[in-house]
């Protein structure tokens, strides 16, 4: 239950969106010695635990008995997560700025591909964190844990539970650190500021990884590079999937305004596309209006001004207006508070005094700046 400028928010948690206050956690978990744990926070007794948590070079001295007490401290977080499994294998990496990354996954005998896939998670995290921090703001904690869980993917402070080592899910859940764990937006009222912004950010991280890691791995393999480039030419680009999902929703009759409480949508379909896809398109279209470079500056300023402060949609727009110098209330009101759509058509085309002229007509009810590209007979644009 959270109290803010609107009063108390006693919204029940129904395994969907949540809204909570930051606090400091101290947690002690006593469990059979055979279990390996991972989760939120910093382990306070690593040299009594071992399992890869010990200080490099230190001798592990576990207490007598068949149980261990794991002692965690987690400052300035709004939830605490932990997982335990006797079959976890623990990979540890340290980034250039001193953040410790933990990967805990279920070891499978005689399955080296499983080991390689989870090792790739650790290596990819080290690779992309500098890009993430430069683009979205510094990671403020000392550790992050990628933990093999039982279902899907779910984000928590300092860690995530993952059903598998797919990097798309890994990046998405990690980016929830920037778009929820650090912002603390009321997800019940603004799920699109959580899931939509995370979708948009993780697509950028995936593109960075693809261009800077995947492609480099293929150097010297001309056939593989050609195959990757040919696939890239026909596969969706960045936000294309989200645009298609939004278009389908807009035509379906199930769309509701994004101001709808996340638990009160008439359909899960309407909620899902609004929160994820239309939220992602919101961020991409903002870049179309103000320019991608300015949009990126907006995100860094948003992080600077509003981390650990529970921003709402108006707070975001005010930052965008400050950075861009453009009035943007209209954009928020049309896109978020209505289901009006953007659609323009060519109304007429004529020649006047040797000059070709084109008149556009707005068909949809939502206004939007429009760029037009003309292609001439010789192929020039």
Please state what every model-predicted region is:
Residues 2-171, 200:
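Hydrophobic helix-coil surface modules that form long, contiguous segments used
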Residues 19-21, 64-66, 277, 352, ...:
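Solvent-exposed loop and beta-edge segments used for protein-protein assembly and interaction
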Residues 31, 76, 352, 364-366, ...:
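Short loop/turn positions at the edges of beta-strands in beta-sheet-rich folds
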Residues 72, 103-363:
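Hydrophobic alpha-helical and helix-loop surface patches within well-folded domains
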């Amino acid at each position: 239950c959270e109290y803010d400028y609107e009063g108390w928010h006693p919204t029940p948690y129904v395994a969907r969106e949540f809204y909570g206050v930051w606090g400091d956690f101290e947690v002690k978990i006593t469990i059979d010695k055979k279990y390996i744990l991972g989760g939120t926070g910093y382990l306070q007794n690593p040299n009594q635990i071992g399992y890869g948590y010990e200080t490099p070079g230190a001798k592990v001295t576990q207490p007598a008995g068949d149980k261990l007490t794991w002692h965690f401290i987690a400052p300035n977080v709004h939830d605490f997560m932990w997982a335990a499994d006797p079959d976890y294998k623990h990979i540890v990496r340290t980034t250039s700025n001193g953040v410790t990354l933990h990967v805990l996954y279920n070891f499978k005998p005689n399955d080296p591909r499983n080991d390689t896939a989870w090792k790739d998670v650790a290596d990819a995290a080290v690779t992309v964190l500098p890009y993430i921090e430069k683009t979205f703001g510094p990671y403020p904690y000392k550790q992050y844990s990628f933990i093999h869980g039982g279902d899907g993917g779910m984000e928590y402070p300092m860690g995530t539970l993952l059903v598998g080592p797919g990097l798309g899910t890994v990046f998405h859940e990690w980016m929830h650190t920037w778009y929820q764990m650090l912002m603390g937006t009321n997800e019940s009222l603004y799920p699109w500021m959580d899931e939509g912004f995370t979708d948009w950010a993780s697509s950028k991280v995936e593109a960075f990884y693809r261009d800077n890691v995947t492609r480099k791995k293929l150097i010297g393999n001309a056939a593989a590079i050609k195959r990757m480039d040919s696939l890239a030419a026909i596969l969706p680009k960045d936000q294309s999937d989200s645009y298609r999902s939004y278009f389908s929703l807009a035509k379906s009759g199930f769309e509701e305004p994004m101001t709808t409480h996340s638990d009160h949508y008439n359909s899960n379909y309407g909620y899902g596309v609004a929160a994820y896809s239309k939220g992602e398109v919101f961020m991409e279209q903002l870049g179309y209006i103000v320019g991608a470079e300015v949009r990126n500056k907006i995100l860094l300023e948003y992080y600077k001004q509003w981390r650990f402060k529970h921003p709402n949609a108006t707070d975001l727009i005010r930052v965008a207006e400050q950075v861009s110098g453009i009035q943007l209330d209209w954009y928020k009101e049309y896109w978020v508070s209505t289901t009006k759509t953007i659609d323009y058509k060519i109304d007429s085309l004529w020649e006047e005094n040797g000059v070709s002229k084109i008149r556009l007509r707005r068909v949809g009810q939502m206004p939007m700046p429009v760029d037009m590209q003309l292609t001439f007979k010789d192929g020039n644009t």
